[in-house]
Each structure stands twice: as structure tokens, then as C-alpha cells.
């Protein structure tokens, strides 16, 4: 590597709003404040909700379906 052209790589602290503190290496140069992390994000904790409640086709079929009709 060439000397003097790369940014300084140092250890910084990333603090999440849930209280989790992570020490990482970065070129940012200052401590980071995070909104979500792997400890509190709904995808990783398993507390996610299914937001897809059907699309336009499902709504159309529900509105115009005939009760007792064959599919």
C-alpha cells in the first residue's frame, strides 16, 4: 500500500438506542449513535409483523366473489 494516502483506521464505539454498545473499527473517527442494531431490530428478534394484507387482486376477488361459486 502507498503510505500517506489512506484514512486513519481506528476503533470507535457504536451505541444503540436500546443500550447495546459495540466496539468496531472505522475510518469515521468519532463515536456513532445508532437507532437500531442486531439486538433490537424486529427482523433479528423475531418480533416482526406481516404487513402484507393482500393486494388489489385479493381485494377485487373478495368484493366481487359469488358465494357458493366454483373456482
Swiss-Prot record:
GO terms for cellular component: ribonucleoprotein complex; ribosome. Zn(2+) binds at residues 16, 18, 37, 40. One of its GO terms (biological process) is translation. It holds the Pfam family Ribosomal_L31. Keywords: Metal-binding, Ribonucleoprotein, Ribosomal protein, RNA-binding, rRNA-binding, Zinc. Its cofactor is Zn(2+). GO terms for molecular function: metal ion binding; rRNA binding; structural constituent of ribosome. Part of the 50S ribosomal subunit. Belongs to the bacterial ribosomal protein bL31 family. Type A subfamily. HAMAP family: Ribosomal_bL31_1 (MF_00501). Binds the 23S rRNA. This is Large ribosomal subunit protein bL31.
Amino acid at each position: 500500500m502507498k503510505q500517506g494516502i489512506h484514512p486513519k483506521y481506528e476503533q470507535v464505539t457504536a451505541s444503540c438506542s436500546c443500550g447495546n454498545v459495540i466496539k468496531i473499527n472505522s475510518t469515521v473517527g468519532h463515536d456513532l449513535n445508532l437507532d437500531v442494531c442486531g439486538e433490537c431490530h424486529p427482523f433479528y428478534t423475531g418480533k416482526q409483523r406481516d404487513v402484507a394484507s393482500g393486494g388489489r387482486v385479493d381485494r377485487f376477488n373478495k368484493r366481487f366473489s359469488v358465494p357458493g361459486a366454483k373456482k
